[in-house]
């Protein structure tokens, strides 16, 4: 699926004394298989932006366009065939977007406090709720639940448990499994690691990486720039409802002056690397702690060998 936003503007409480414009002329597109990090200060418009991606919000002005493959019934051959579909909102004012189901089953959104989305008596019922609502056979949905509960790192036995007996991190995994069970083309996650312990953070990020490697589009809204540096292939920076940067993670996040000018804390990894470079250590481009540790080990080994040979 390809998503295109063209000159999207959005105003809350339009024509009232509480009117507030949250997005100003947003232009960007996301292609199938990308891993995009979206960053910016609180109030920069990140959540408002992603709510346009699956038609939870409709632009005040501008357009959102979705291009995707779908199956239609061919009356001539009496068989289903695959076609490319283009849906657009914003070309004319409508109260209700008719294609919302087709869009939302292809673009799954896991919000920051996803655990509050759980409301059924069992984990199984919660996971299959979305797929069944969008037309999946209940038996097939149960098989998807068994598949994705394991993918998010929970045993199948958890399907029988009440979601309200789970920890916050476990609830978030169940909410993620519920979205994945719909098998969307695009997965949008809003602060997916907030409040998790380091091991939980790594597991969630590994799941997102695995999904990306399997061909899904990942859009990760986060305050943790180290996660964007290590995992994302593209980063979008928002400020006051505008995109002020759209580029490669390393080049963008290593621009310390740009980050500080926009009140963003540089990644801890690059802070440390830049301190080493300031002391004359020629550290190469690294994007993860593992890469840095590996390079330091090689560097120290080479340095020690030179010192021994000079004795």
UniProtKB/Swiss-Prot annotation:
Query: What SUPFAM superfamilies has UniProt attached to this entry?
Result: P-loop containing nucleoside triphosphate hydrolases (SSF52540)
Name of the protein: Energy-coupling factor transporter ATP-binding protein EcfA2
Write down the InterPro entries for this protein, in alphabetical order: AAA+_ATPase (IPR003593), ABC_transporter-like_ATP-bd (IPR003439), ABC_transporter-like_CS (IPR017871), ABC_transpr_CbiO/EcfA_su (IPR015856), ECF_ABC_transporter_ATP-bd (IPR050095), EcfA2 (IPR030946), P-loop_NTPase (IPR027417)
Asked if the Swiss-Prot or TrEMBL record annotates the protein with the keyword Nucleus, the reply is no
Q: Which family does it belong to?
A: Belongs to the ABC transporter superfamily. Energy-coupling factor EcfA family.
What membrane topology was assigned to this protein in its record?
Answer: Peripheral membrane protein
Q: Name one GO molecular function term.
A: ATP binding
The chain's disulfide connectivity reads none
Q: Where in the cell is it found?
A: Cell membrane
Sorted alphabetically, which Gene3D superfamilies does this protein's record hold? P-loop containing nucleotide triphosphate hydrolases
Function, as annotated:
ATP-binding (A) component of a common energy-coupling factor (ECF) ABC-transporter complex. Unlike classic ABC transporters this ECF transporter provides the energy necessary to transport a number of different substrates.
List, for all copies, the residue spans of the domain called ABC transporter: 3-265
> GO CC terms on record?
ATP-binding cassette (ABC) transporter complex
EC code(s) of this entry: 7.-.-.-
Q: Which NCBIfam families match?
A: ECF_ATPase_2, PRK13651.1
Q: What class of enzyme is it?
A: translocase
Task: Give the binding site residues for ATP.
Answer: 40-47
Main location group = membrane
Gene designation per UniProt: ecfA2
Report the source organism.
Mycoplasmopsis synoviae (strain 53) (Mycoplasma synoviae)
Assembly information from the UniProt record: Forms a stable energy-coupling factor (ECF) transporter complex composed of 2 membrane-embedded substrate-binding proteins (S component), 2 ATP-binding proteins (A component) and 2 transmembrane proteins (T component).
Query: What keywords would UniProt list here?
Result: ATP-binding, Cell membrane, Membrane, Nucleotide-binding, Translocase, Transport
